[in-house]
């Protein structure tokens, strides 16, 4: 993997990420494709209509169903899903914790029960890499010990030491495997305790292909989250991509870009779409509301997305009310277009040294009215 830092505007960064299957311009938003697809969309929607170059798939879910060996036999995630871009896969640790009532944390890994059939499984740092090798992920995340917030200081210290130990073990194994097309990212933990974040960075080897700021958006306030990012991002290697996991709103993303973050993922655009909430530059609208029943205009005037160029709010209102499956596709295409355009415009602003004014103008407009 090659990461080229092209421009900075104060702390905001614009770069190019060269992966085995694509070249990705940063800042980048990665649509979430948990089961190997973005919910309600296929690979053609992702790559040709949205122009997405990098999407996230979930190691936990692909391991349990259909199984990483099946995906490997079928040519890896790219061939299986017919997606010509790149995949980032997370380690599955978060899902093991959040989806199972019976999780046991051990020094060598995480024991959990499948949310599908109750069968017992062990994720170790090596096991999750082997799964991701079978998936042939462009970017693989190490197994980490995630802590919900608030958390006692002792638990945070345990988490960062265990996460760093697992990360460094993963890096040693990855070097032995000699798989240059599968890049390995470390994850920095420590909650909102800044000293713990510094310690986590210090304990983590500097030889990873990229670094993620994990363990945020799990119960802390927005101010605490931003303070943690502002503290942590400058501690990470400047020549490696920085990934903020699972965040978030348009405001969160712009704030994090201004603090030096390059990569983002979140289920918000697609989940909100399925639940009738659509993003516009003037804020969010709820398409299920009665005023849209006879509204013959697109979701947003001047929006170039597939949906806005073809369909009215009235049609989307009808599809949602009728519980038609097509609604989820059209709404998701719009919301993902909004997010992808947001980071694209942020990138252009960084290249032109006007990011702060771009951010200010966007937020003023976005908060100007509610629908």
From Swiss-Prot:
Enzyme Commission number(s) of this protein: 2.4.2.29
UniProt xrefs under NCBIfam families: Q_tRNA_tgt, tgt_general
Function summary: Catalyzes the base-exchange of a guanine (G) residue with the queuine precursor 7-aminomethyl-7-deazaguanine (PreQ1) at position 34 (anticodon wobble position) in tRNAs with GU(N) anticodons (tRNA-Asp, -Asn, -His and -Tyr). Catalysis occurs through a double-displacement mechanism. The nucleophile active site attacks the C1' of nucleotide 34 to detach the guanine base from the RNA, forming a covalent enzyme-RNA intermediate. The proton acceptor active site deprotonates the incoming PreQ1, allowing a nucleophilic attack on the C1' of the ribose to form the product.
Quaternary structure, from the entry: Homodimer. Within each dimer, one monomer is responsible for RNA recognition and catalysis, while the other monomer binds to the replacement base PreQ1.
Binding site for Zn(2+): 303, 305, 308, 334
Biological pathway: tRNA modification; tRNA-queuosine biosynthesis
Protein name (database record): Queuine tRNA-ribosyltransferase
Catalytic activity: 7-aminomethyl-7-carbaguanine + guanosine(34) in tRNA = 7-aminomethyl-7-carbaguanosine(34) in tRNA + guanine
PANTHER family given in the database record: QUEUINE TRNA-RIBOSYLTRANSFERASE CATALYTIC SUBUNIT 1 (PTHR43530:SF1)
UniProt family annotation: Belongs to the queuine tRNA-ribosyltransferase family.
Gene, per the UniProt record: tgt
């Amino acid at each position: 993997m090659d990461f080229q830092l092209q421009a900075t505007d104060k702390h905001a960064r614009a770069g190019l990420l060269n992966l085995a299957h694509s070249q990705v311009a940063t800042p980048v938003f990665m649509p979430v494709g948990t089961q190997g697809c973005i919910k309600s969309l296929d690979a053609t929607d992702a790559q040709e209509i949205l122009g997405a170059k990098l999407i996230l798939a979930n190691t936990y879910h692909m391991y349990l169903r259909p199984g990483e060996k099946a995906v490997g036999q079928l040519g890896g995630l790219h061939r299986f899903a017919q997606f010509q871009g790149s995949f980032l896969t997370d380690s599955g640790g978060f899902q093991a914790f959040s989806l199972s009532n019976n999780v046991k944390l051990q020094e060598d890994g995480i024991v959990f029960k499948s949310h599908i059939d109750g069968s017992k499984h062990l994720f170790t740092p090596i096991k999750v890499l082997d799964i991701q090798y079978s998936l042939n992920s462009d970017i693989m995340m190490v197994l980490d010990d995630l802590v919900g917030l608030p958390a006692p200081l002792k638990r945070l210290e345990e988490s960062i030491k265990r996460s760093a130990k697992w990360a460094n073990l993963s890096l040693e194994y990855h070097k032995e495997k000699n798989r240059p097309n599968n890049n390995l990212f470390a994850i920095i933990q420590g909650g909102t305790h800044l000293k713990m974040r510094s310690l986590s960075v210090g304990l983590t080897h500097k030889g990873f292909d990229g670094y993620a700021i994990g363990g945020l958006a799990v119960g802390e306030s927005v101010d605490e989250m931003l303070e943690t990012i502002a503290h942590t991002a400058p501690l990470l290697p400047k020549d490696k991509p920085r990934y903020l996991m699972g965040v978030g709103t348009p405001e969160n993303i712009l704030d994090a870009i201004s603090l030096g973050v390059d990569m983002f993922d979140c289920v918000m655009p697609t989940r909100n779409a399925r639940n009738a909430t659509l993003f516009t530059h003037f804020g969010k609208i709820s398409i299920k509301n009665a005023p849209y029943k006879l509204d013959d205009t697109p979701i947003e005037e001047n929006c170039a997305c597939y949906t806005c160029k073809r369909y009215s709010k009235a049609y989307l209102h009808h599809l949602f009310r009728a519980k038609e499956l097509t609604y989820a596709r059209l709404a998701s295409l719009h919301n993902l277009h909004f997010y992808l355009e947001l980071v694209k415009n942020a990138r252009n602003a960084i290249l032109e040294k006007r990011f702060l004014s771009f951010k200010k103008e966007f937020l003023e407009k976005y908060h100007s009215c509610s629908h």
